[in-house]
Amino acid sequence: MSEGDSVGDSVHGKPSVVYRFFTRLGQIYQSWLDKSTPHTAVRWVVTLGLSFIYMIRVYLLQGWYIVTYALGIYHLNLFIAFLSPKVDPSLMEDSDDGPSLPTKQNEEFRPFIRRLPEFKFWHAATKGILVAMVCTFFEAFNVPVFWPILVMYFIMLFCITMKRQIKHMIKYRYIPFTHGKRTYKGKEDAGKAFAS
């Protein structure tokens, strides 16, 4: 293999201009993502704003309903992964039918670890909206369809999926919206005298 045959190398062994450009672009993008990580509320407000702009665009153009339906299903899939635990509790159960000895205390604190963390959920949802927005600029993605049917399909799919997810939460007793272990406060200072 000669010097210039490796990926991204020019004839003289240095990275090509195109390779350096895209590497630098990737570094800038990652830097912006890193800076936005602690600003959860701002990130979601921007995503909701993009979603609102997308909905207005689809409403005004009166088309691209298939793209919108696909975006809705993609967001539903992300949301279910966000609500699901990283390790499925149904896989951790013993398959034995007989009695077994307890191995854990019932009150043991187990933090909820998501299958899809919040930042990755936000990032994927935002990218999905941007891709759908780009699709609305191409007539090839404007497939004629009777949109009320898609709305009904999406509502049915949402209800069935969420019902299954809620049953799973109840069965395995986990709540995906806890922020940590509960702390209990003692009684208020009982030594205070009553005002008479």
UniProtKB/Swiss-Prot annotation:
Listed InterPro entries: Rer1
Metal-binding in keyword set: no
Segments passing through the bilayer: 41-61, 63-83, 140-160
Modified residue annotations for N-acetylserine: S2
GO biological process: protein retention in ER lumen; retrograde vesicle-mediated transport, Golgi to endoplasmic reticulum
Membrane topology field: Multi-pass membrane protein
GO cellular component: endoplasmic reticulum; Golgi membrane
UniProt-listed Pfam families: Rer1
Coiled coil: none
Keywords: Acetylation, Golgi apparatus, Membrane, Phosphoprotein, Transmembrane, Transmembrane helix
Phosphoserine found at: S2, S6, S10, S95
Key word Transmembrane helix present: yes
Family annotation (PANTHER family): PROTEIN RER1 (PTHR10743:SF0)
Its job: Involved in the retrieval of endoplasmic reticulum membrane proteins from the early Golgi compartment.
Family indicated by similarity: Belongs to the RER1 family.
Protein name: Protein RER1
Organism: Bos taurus
